[in-house]
């Protein structure tokens, strides 16, 4: 493909997919054992050597932070053999949080081209998958005392206000126009539905633009049908419901905003297809634009490199922080970049520590850029191809908050499509996430555990 053919003329910068290659190629494999959390199965896939030159390091993590860890030698294991190992971890508390076990194999000594302490294998799995995430989340009467949501509707706008916030919607197109917390507007453009991604090299090769182009402007061209306001009798919840028609797709879309007296906003999107036969969707989600100052991104999800539905096993779930510009990878030809899968929450903050927290009701796909999608999208027959290194920062943070993002494929680079299990079929879909303001005193991880709806 383009990336491979260009390797001889590129600087020695690793592409993000190398970490998935490393994971798939690893010669030490770890598996959970049914009905126990402490026992694991280790398989040595080497053809000739044992594992005496490697150390096993284990870590139990919650909210991206280690709460237990240890190190041990592997048992004596011949090539192509398996063994069971007991990890000496303590019981996992039933506190409603997610706990993950991460297993890593490191070299004990230096070898040609391989330093001592080099990670040669990694695996991670959740220890309490049956536990409900955010089970311990509560909101108390004390937090809501003397706080209400006030509403106002004019011919041009719907406005919701509270003690330290103001949220406004245009009645002309249903878009959120203000998200003010403590006098600062956190948006330059409000949430809009988005079904398109900047085409990857594999997308171009399999005629994705011709096959799925109906989705490119589906969100932008959505026609407002109605916008309604409802508030409960004690002013503890205000709801704005926006209904759209996707005319070319013969489908409908509903976005519901629920607002609590503390300024927390739950956003729910509901897509319903009609009878028209439609191709797969490149992505299913929403996007918004924030001021450029909110350029420090922290997320609890897979990382730190970009990853996708069919390319994510080499990127453990963890707590990561980077600038928004660091999310961008300069491929030879500019294209989709920076996606993170299985994101529990993401925070975008300015240098003062203020910003916005997004928490998914289910794990999200999230990406953030310093430019609009159009800057990296593929333009057919454009003689001036955009080199990844030519993309420039703009005065913005483009934030994608997706329920689904299709895989990248790659069985070959001359026509193979993404496997069906990693595509997005246009049936009925709905998802939700919550937005909350962050002060410089707020711990984003702890605030993400609050449940306001």
Functional labels for PLM-detected ranges:
Residues 1-82, 86, 91-93, 363-398, ...:
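Substrate-binding clefts and catalytic carboxylate motifs of secreted carbohydrate-active enzymes
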Residues 30-33, 114-116, 296-299:
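Acidic/polar loop patches that form or flank catalytic/metal-binding clefts of enzymes
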Residues 39-46, 87, 101-105, 164, ...:
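Buried hydrophobic-core signal for structured, non-transmembrane domains
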Residues 55, 98-102:
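Short, conserved beta-strand segments of beta-strand-rich sandwich/propeller modules, principally
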Residues 68-70, 118-123:
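Extracellular and select intracellular beta-sandwich modules with Ser/Thr-enriched
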Residues 79-80, 117-119:
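Glycine-centered loop/turn motifs
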Residues 88-96, 111, 126-453:
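Beta-strand/loop-rich accessory regions of lumenal/periplasmic or secreted enzymes
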Residues 105-114:
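Short acidic/polar inter-strand loop motif in beta-rich domains
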């Amino acid at each position: 493909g383009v990336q491979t053919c260009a390797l001889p003329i590129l600087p020695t910068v690793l592409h993000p997919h190398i970490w998935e290659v490393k994971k798939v190629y690893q010669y030490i494999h770890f598996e959970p054992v049914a009905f126990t959390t402490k026992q694991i199965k280790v398989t040595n896939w080497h053809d000739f050597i044992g594992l005496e030159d490697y150390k096993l390091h284990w870590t139990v993590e919650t909210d991206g932070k280690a709460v237990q860890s240890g190190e041990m030698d592997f048992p004596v294991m011949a090539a192509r053999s398996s063994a069971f190992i007991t990890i000496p971890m303590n019981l996992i508390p039933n506190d409603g949080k997610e706990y993950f076990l991460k297993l890593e194999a490191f070299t004990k000594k230096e070898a040609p081209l391989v330093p001592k302490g080099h990670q040669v294998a990694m695996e991670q799995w959740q220890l309490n998958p049956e536990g409900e995430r955010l089970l311990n989340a509560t909101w108390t009467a004390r937090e809501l005392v003397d706080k209400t949501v006030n509403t106002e509707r004019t011919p041009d706008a719907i406005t919701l206000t509270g003690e330290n916030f103001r949220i406004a919607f245009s009645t002309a197109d249903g878009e959120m126009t203000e998200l003010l917390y403590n006098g600062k507007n956190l948006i330059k453009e409000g949430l809009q539905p988005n079904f398109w991604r900047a085409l990857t090299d594999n997308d171009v090769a399999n005629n994705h633009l011709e096959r799925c182009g109906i989705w490119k402007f589906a969100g932008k061209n959505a026609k407002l049908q109605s916008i309604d306001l409802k508030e409960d009798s004690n002013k503890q919840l205000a709801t704005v419901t926006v209904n759209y028609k996707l005319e070319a797709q013969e489908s409908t879309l509903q976005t519901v905003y629920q607002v609590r007296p503390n300024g927390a906003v739950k956003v729910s999107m509901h897509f319903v297809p009609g009878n028209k036969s439609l191709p797969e969707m490149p992505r299913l989600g929403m996007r918004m634009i924030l001021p450029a100052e909110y350029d420090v991104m922290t997320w609890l999800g897979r990382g730190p490199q970009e990853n996708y539905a069919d390319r994510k096993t080499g990127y453990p779930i963890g707590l990561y922080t980077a600038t928004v510009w660091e999310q961008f990878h300069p491929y030879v030809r500019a294209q989709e970049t920076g996606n993170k899968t299985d994101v529990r929450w993401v925070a975008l903050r300015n240098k003062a520590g203020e910003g916005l927290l997004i928490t998914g009701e289910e794990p999200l796909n999230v990406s953030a850029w310093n430019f609009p999608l159009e800057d990296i999208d593929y333009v057919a027959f454009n003689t001036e191809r955009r080199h990844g290194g030519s993309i420039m920062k703009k005065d913005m943070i483009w934030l994608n908050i997706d329920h689904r993002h299709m895989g990248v494929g790659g069985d070959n680079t001359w026509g193979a499509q993404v496997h069906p299990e990693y595509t997005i079929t246009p049936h009925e879909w709905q998802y939700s996430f919550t937005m909350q303001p962050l002060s410089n005193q707020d711990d984003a991880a702890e605030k993400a555990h609050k449940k306001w709806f």
